[in-house]
From Swiss-Prot:
GO terms for biological process: DNA repair; DNA-templated DNA replication. This is Replication factor C small subunit. Part of the RFC clamp loader complex which loads the PCNA sliding clamp onto DNA. InterPro entries: AAA+_ATPase (IPR003593), ATPase_AAA_core (IPR003959), DNA_pol3_clamp-load_cplx_C (IPR008921), DNA_Rep/Repair_Clamp_Loader (IPR050238), P-loop_NTPase (IPR027417), Rep_factor-C_ssu_arc (IPR023748), Rep_factorC_C (IPR013748), RFC_lid (IPR047854). GO terms for cellular component: DNA replication factor C complex. Belongs to the activator 1 small subunits family. RfcS subfamily. PANTHER family: REPLICATION FACTOR C / DNA POLYMERASE III GAMMA-TAU SUBUNIT, REPLICATION FACTOR C SUBUNIT 4. GO terms for molecular function: ATP binding; ATP hydrolysis activity; DNA binding; DNA clamp loader activity. Keywords: ATP-binding, DNA replication, Nucleotide-binding. NCBIfam families: PRK00440.1. Heteromultimer composed of small subunits (RfcS) and large subunits (RfcL). It comes from Nanoarchaeum equitans (strain Kin4-M). The lineage of its organism: Archaea, Nanobdellota, Candidatus Nanoarchaeia, Nanoarchaeales, Nanoarchaeaceae. Pfam families: AAA (PF00004), Rep_fac_C (PF08542). The gene is rfcS.
């Protein structure tokens, strides 16, 4: 079975959605057959890799594979491996009338500061024959000497209507049936948090089980509790029904295989929907931050979640004290 993220990946710059200013710049590079080193920054699944591939397709045509080297900083065994691969790749002349090749380094922010310094030297050494496109989720994790040597493009998350358009294209292409289109789109958008790649992978996993897609199946595959289920736990806790809230929470953790951190993240997303004042919401979020820190530091998940439910039940957030 073909992977849908590749099957439906745009091959042309014009087909990229939601990044209009970036598209204009990329098309200008194609017309001039020249470009600087680039840095694509933005959340996962917003089209950074797609943009790099589309640029390569339009610059090099059928010879794009010979002129485009894709590396992943998380997968490679170190900067020495990257240096060796770039050296071997840059040694051969470009095929066609574009006077440079492209090295695409994904997850560049995963490199240590020392490795990034080494990468900067590699970029300088091979700049005559090679252009680098670096991709990262966190722009702030890229060292300033690299930032100053690249043109930065910041990718924004997909807006919901663009997201809907792309999902519906896949639904039509694969002959899927959505039990309720609005609910399915909203659920996928909520689960993936704007990450289109994640949304497509979840949709494909659901389709392998049945051509009819339901909201329940999407959340089960994603191992995330539905928002209304988290709301019910919070409401019970805030009403002082500690044992009932605790029982419901344990059931959700078992049903979806959620860790303590997963639960905390789900609760954080629902706090702003609670019918309480903004200041009370801030107090709850502050408490959640403390609980999350303890869990990350190794404290028992259930003990910490119990403490949070009890804190909510006692109405501590109303007193503006911890």
């Amino acid at each position: 079975m073909e992977i849908w993220t590749e099957k439906y990946r745009p091959k042309r710059i014009d087909d990229i959605i939601n990044q209009e200013e970036i598209k204009k710049a990329l098309k200008s590079f194609v017309e001039k057959k020249n470009m600087p080193h680039l840095l694509f920054a933005g959340p996962p699944g917003t089209g950074k890799t797609t943009a790099a591939l589309a640029l390569a397709h339009e610059l090099y045509g059928d010879a794009w594979r010979e002129n485009f080297l894709e590396l992943n900083a998380s997968d490679e065994r170190g900067i020495d491996v990257i240096r060796h691969k770039v050296k071997e790749f840059a040694r051969a002349k470009p095929i066609g009338d574009v006077p440079f090749k492209i090295v695409f380094l994904d997850e560049a922010d995963a490199l240590t500061r020392d490795a990034q310094q080494a990468l900067r030297r590699i970029m300088e050494k091979y700049s005559q024959s090679t252009r680098f496109i670096l991709s990262c989720n966190y722009f702030s994790k890229i060292i300033e000497p690299i930032q100053s040597r690249v043109t930065v493009f910041k990718f924004k998350p997909l807006e919901k209507e663009a997201f809907r358009e792309l999902i519906n294209r896949i639904v039509k292409g694969e002959g899927l049936i959505l039990e309720n289109e609005d609910e399915i789109i909203n659920a996928l958008y909520d689960i993936a948090e704007g990450d289109l790649r994640k949304a497509i992978n979840i949709l494909q996993a659901a389709a392998m089980m049945s051509k009819t897609i339901t909201v329940d199946r999407l959340y089960e595959i994603a191992s995330i509790a539905k928002p209304k289920e988290i709301d019910e736990v919070l409401n019970k806790a805030m009403q002082g029904n500690f044992l009932e809230a605790r029982s419901m929470l344990i059931d959700l953790m078992l049903k979806y295989g959620m860790s303590g951190e997963d639960v905390i993240k789900a609760i954080q997303k629902r706090v702003w929907s609670l019918p309480i004042s903004d200041r009370e919401k801030l107090m709850i979020l502050d408490k959640i931050g403390d609980i999350e820190f303890r869990i990350v530091e190794g404290a028992d998940d259930l003990v910490q979640l119990d403490a949070l439910l009890a804190w909510l039940g006692l109405g501590k957030y109303k007193n503006f004290t911890s």
